């Protein structure tokens, strides 16, 4: 029942552009011709960067590639993806601090871990942008960054799962190894962050 697929580059071993093109080509050829594809570029984890030239080459070859999710704090790269003579990709940002800048540059949205917990702010920013309230959107963006900064130093996936449990989205915050369980002081910090967020947003649970 999936509406589309996100395809990530292979990890660990570095590949040149030709090898990456062949990889994506082989995966996409195994899909129905009209099945929407997003390239998921997270070079900090895969070590294999999908550069703008490669994205355009892939989009020229495969009409069902509709966009890219880019997870790196590089606004110039966002602009490079969108400045093209060919088909313009739907660009989703995976870096919370660039959400508003991505929209202002021509991106269409975000796919974000913290957004699954603090969704009121992310949806408000998007609505403010759509309504032309750029000053309001900038203030909301600042709030998003402030919360993200408070999470620095706590292991990311365990922190998100703990917050999702606090939010009532999941029943357990257990993570598989090698991710470690959070310490009690780390959980306490997350509880304080979530409580402060609920107070600011007027959330009563």
Spans of model-derived segments:
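Active-site beta->alpha loop and helix N-cap motifs at the rims of alpha/beta catalytic domains
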Residues: 1-47, 57
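Hydrophobic alpha-helix-in-membranes signature
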Residues: 9, 35, 42, 62, ...
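Conserved beta-strand edge residues that scaffold enzyme active sites
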Residues: 11-12, 98, 116, 178
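Residue-level detector of functional hotspots within protein domains
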Residues: 23, 54, 77, 165-168
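Catalytic alpha/beta core domains of metabolic enzymes, predominantly
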Residues: 30-33, 42-152
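C-terminal alpha-helical cap/extension of soluble enzyme domains
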Residues: 111-114, 118-205
């Amino acid at each position: 029942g999936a509406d589309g697929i996100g395809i990530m580059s292979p990890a660990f071993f570095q590949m040149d552009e030709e090898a990456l093109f062949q990889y994506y080509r082989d995966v996409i050829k195994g899909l129905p011709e009209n099945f929407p594809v997003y390239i998921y570029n997270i070079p900090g984890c895969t070590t294999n960067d999908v550069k703008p030239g490669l994205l355009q080459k892939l989009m020229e070859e495969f009409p069902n590639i509709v966009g890219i999710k880019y997870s790196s704090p590089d606004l110039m790269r966002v602009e490079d993806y969108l400045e093209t003579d060919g088909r313009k990709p739907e660009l989703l940002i995976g870096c919370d601090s660039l959400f508003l800048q991505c929209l202002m540059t021509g991106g269409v949205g975000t796919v974000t871990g913290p957004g699954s917990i603090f969704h009121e702010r992310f949806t408000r920013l998007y609505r403010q942008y759509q309504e032309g309230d750029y000053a309001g959107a900038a203030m909301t963006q600042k709030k998003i960054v402030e919360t993200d900064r408070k999470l620095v130093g706590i292991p990311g996936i365990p922190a998100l799962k703990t917050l999702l449990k606090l939010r009532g989205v999941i029943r357990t915050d257990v993570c598989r190894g090698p991710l470690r369980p959070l310490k009690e002081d780390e959980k306490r910090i997350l509880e304080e962050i979530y409580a402060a967020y609920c107070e600011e947003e007027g959330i009563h649970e």
